[in-house]
Amino acid sequence: MLSKFSAATLLSTGLSIPASCRLIILLAALSVVGFHAGHAAPPPAAQPLALTPPMGWNDWAHYQCGINEQIILDNASALVKTGLAARGYSTVTIDDCWMLKDRDAAGNLQADPVRFPHGMKYVADAVHHLGLKFGIYEDSGSTTCAEFAGSGWPKGGGSDHFIQDASLFASWGVDYLKLDGCNVYVYFASEGPAAYRKAYDEEHVALKNTGRPIVFSESAPAYFEFSPEWYDVLTWVRNFGQLWREGDDIATYSAKTPDQPRFASVLWNYAYNLPLGRFQKPGNWNDPDFIIAGDPGMSLAESRSQLALWSMMSAPLILSSDVGKLNPDALAILGNRRVIAIDQDPLGQMATLVERKPGMDLLLKPLKDGDYAVAVLNRSEAPLEVIIDPVALGFASASGCTFDAENLWSGERTFTLTTLNADIAPHDTAIWSIHTHTACGEPTRTGAIVMTTDKPHGSIDGYAHCLAATGAVEECAGTPEQTWTFTEEGALDSAQGCLSAVDGKPALKPCSGADAQQHWNYTLSGNLVNASNNLCLTNASPSATGQPLTVQACGHNQLNQIWSLPN
């Protein structure tokens, strides 16, 4: 859960201190009142955590601060009774507002005695008794987003509580920690990333030293969303936790406006998450926020779309709804074993955006067993008829490529197909698993190459533009000129030739594996660096369309040099 203040506001918290203090970043004291120094050493060969995307339930998107002990335990019981726990939704996490604003005399967090009269150890034990895991929320700042006691150092500096709180959580039996990023004290705004890194590193070490395996969900990237620092933070969070929120919250439910549509929020979170596949691998997951499928404000078609899209992105599947009130159709969607298996596939690779045109996205995801998942999202308000040729997915263009397909919603299987055909309702998503035959070969890394704009918080079409063989970035239209193959040699191959760096300008030339001008190195930061001159493929600005591209000296997180390629 994110504060609704901007990152700049969050990072200016300490500016009331005179500039003459010249504090860089306050170091938290190691001593903590009332805490003893003995810690169990972590197991010498601890097993990696969250090798598949975490699944479970969290209260926030449905209840916000309106939680109590009974609500948490009722939802935990409902996960078991509905069969969702058996499908993998097995971690129950309490979000913000569970604690008091003040700590006790020993400096420990205190559960709100009105909301949780039996305390957190009781709730954790009850959840464990159901065969589930227990998660809890805290904040890396001085207070949580809802202004309750946080784990971080106070405004103006002082001791933090990361070690003390981690020890307390372990004593309660916590299996999962969500650490938010509101109210982190930073003296100079430019030092924000370093302050966040310090906080999350300290929490990582504190959790490790408890000796208890606790999955660590970080929120730091979300507080730098769309800024140049975003990519730095996305790079280092992988060293500390297993998953991270990297952008806007999903729309929450309100009893005052229960039928308020929420699908636009789902599409937006999908939009900002999809281009970040390069940061993800087993044990490290981008988290576009909660699954609200089946909750008020989501139709059945929209619910299918969210589960399908999150599964194609290998995203965490963390429900946030009143589980006991989910109707049978919603339960059937959320409990669909075939779609969940796509999400939980051990390869853990995010889908490639094969094609984007107004109202439609086509996605391809490789699976560990050699099969593939294919999904088509209908973003429009009209029915959509699709016919997908395997060549469009990167398979061999020679005749004879056939495949078997399973419709993952219906379970229907068809054999020896030459195309995938579907009629897709508005806001719905068709999803299949396909098994190709020998003539298809291995698919190439084929799809759209996109640049995200500097005008976020809008539509999918406005957020990302597509590289075209014209030598410019254009609005995505799904044309052959916007389809690229990133070859094993590092060439960017279009139907009209390979992108080359010639005299400081990109140009299409006949493909030649020996031509260094056609070799591009793709970095984790998103740069396309030409092997002949070590210069970066550059747009006039992140939002520019129709303007000639150039190759220029690579800047640090320069937004008009950051690209998302087929995975």
Sequence positions of predicted segments:
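Aromatic-lined carbohydrate-binding/catalytic grooves of carbohydrate-active enzymes
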Residues: 75-189
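Structural recognition of the beta-strand scaffold that forms the well-ordered cores
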Residues: 53-59, 88-95, 133-138, 175-180, ...
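Glycan-recognition surfaces
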Residues: 161-164, 215-322, 343
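Lectin-like carbohydrate-binding module/patch detector with strong preference for beta-trefoil
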Residues: 438-567
